[in-house]
Amino acid sequence: MNDTFMKEKPILPLILSMTLPMVLSMLVNSLYNIIDSFFVAQISEEAMTALSLVYPVQNFINAVGIGFGVGINAVIAFHLGAGDHEKADQAATQGLELAVIHGVVMTVCCITIMPVFLRMFTSSEAVIELGVRYSVVAFAFTLIVTVSMAFEKLYQAVGNMKTTMISLMCGCITNIVLDPVLIFGYGLFPEMGIEGAALATGIGQTLTLAIYLVVYLVRPIRVHIHRQYILPGKKMVIKLYSIGIPATLNLALPSLLISALNAILTAYSEVYILVLGIYYKLQTFIYLPANGIVQGMRPLIGYNYGAGEHKRVSQIYQIVLCMSCIIMVFGTVICLLIPGQLMGLFTHTKATIQAGETALRIIGAGFIVSAVSVTSSGALEGLGKGTPSLLISLCRYVVVIIPAAFLLSRFFGAVGVWNAFWITEVISAVISLIIYRKSIAKPVTTARKE
C-alpha cells in the first residue's frame, strides 16, 4: 500500500475504504451487546439489573483502553503524515507499554471496589451478589482489553482497517456463540449463569488480541515496536497523555452520567434503572456504527492535518457528518416505530416495557442532532486537540444533562430524565459547532508542539 494514500486517494472512496470495515465490525459488536444482554435477561430480571449497574465500570475500563488508544492513534498518524517514522515507532512502543500498566492497575482497583459500588445503587442482596460474580470474571480480562485496544488503534493509524475488522468480528462472533453455551450449559460445558456471560466476553477479547499479535508477527506494518524505545521519553509520554487523557474522559463521562441518572431514578423505582440499562444496550446498535465511522475518520484527519492538507480535512469532516446523520435517522425511526418490541427482548414485565416505550420514543428524538457532537468531537481528537473535544463531551454528559435531568425529574418524574437527553443534544450540537470552527481556525503550528 502506498504510504501517502491517505492524502492522495479521492476523498469519498478513501473514507468508505477506511470507515466501512469499522462500521461492519461495530455492527457485529453492537449485535453482541444486544445478544449478550438478551441471554442474561433469560437468567432473571435481577441479573439484567446487575449487568446494568456494572456497566458504568465496564465502560470506564473501555474508556481508558480506547481513549489512550486514540492518543496512540493520533500521534502515530500525525508523525506518519509528517514523514517522521522514528517518532511513529516510538509512539507505538511506549503507547503499548503504558497500556499494559493501565490494564494491571485497573484490574486490581475495579475488582476491589465493586461490592461498595453496587451498594450505592441497590439494597437488593441478590442483585449485588450477581453483580460481584459477573464483575470478578469480566474484570480479570482487563489487561487483555487495554492491550487489544492499543493494537486496534495502532492498526487504524496506518490505515489497516481490515485487520481491525477481522479481529473484532472474530472476537464478537466467538462471544455470541459461547454466550448461551456457557450461561446455560451444553454438552461438556457446565451451566455457569452470569459468570458464563463474563467468561464468554473474556474469551472473545482474548481471541481478538491473539489475532492482532499473529498478524503483527506474520505481516509487519509501517509502524514497529522497538526495544530501543521501551524506556519512556518525557516528551512522547506527555504527547500521548495530552490526547489520551481528554479522549479517555470523553469516553468515561457516560459512566459518570449513567451513575448520576441511576441515583436520580432510584427515587422513583428500580424499573427505571432497568429501562436505562436496556436503553444503553440498545443505543450501541446506533452509536457503535457511528463510532466506527469516526474511528475511520481519525487517522485520515490526523494524517492530512500533519501533511498540511487543510482543505481535505474540512471535506472529510463534512462527509463523515453526513454519514453519521444517516445512521442516526435509522435509529430515530426504529425507536419511534417499534420501542415495545425492542424492550421485549430484555424483559417480559408489562410495566417495564411500557416505561421503556416512553423512554425510547423521547430519547430517540435527539439522535439525529447528536451526530454533530459525535463527529466534531472525533475530528478534534484526530487533530490532536484533546481539550476542545473534552469540552464537547462535558456538555453532553455532565454540564447540561445532569442538572437538566435533576430539575426536570422534580416536575415530571422519570419522564423528565428522558426529556433531558434530547434537550442536551440540541444544546451540545450548537456548542460543538462553535468549538470545532474556532479550533480548526487556529494555525497548525499551535496544534501540536514537540
Region locations from a protein language model:
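Short alpha-helical transmembrane segments in multi-pass integral membrane proteins
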Residues: M1-T19, I76-L143, F189-I245, I301-G366, ...
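Transmembrane helical elements of multi-pass membrane transporters/channels
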Residues: S17-D36, V137, G171, G204-T208, ...
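Helix-terminus/linker motif at the lipid-water interface of multi-pass membrane proteins
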Residues: L27, L31-T49, L118-E125, V181-M192, ...
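Small-residue-rich hydrophobic transmembrane alpha-helices
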Residues: M48-V108, T112, V145-G159, T163-T164, ...
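Hydrophobic transmembrane alpha-helices of multi-pass small-molecule transporters
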Residues: F60-A63, T107, N175-P180, L209-L213, ...
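Short runs within selected transmembrane alpha-helices of multi-pass transporters and secretion channels
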Residues: G69, N73, A138-Q156, T164-C172, ...
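Structural signal for membrane-spanning alpha-helices in multi-pass inner-membrane proteins
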Residues: C110, K153, D179, I183, ...
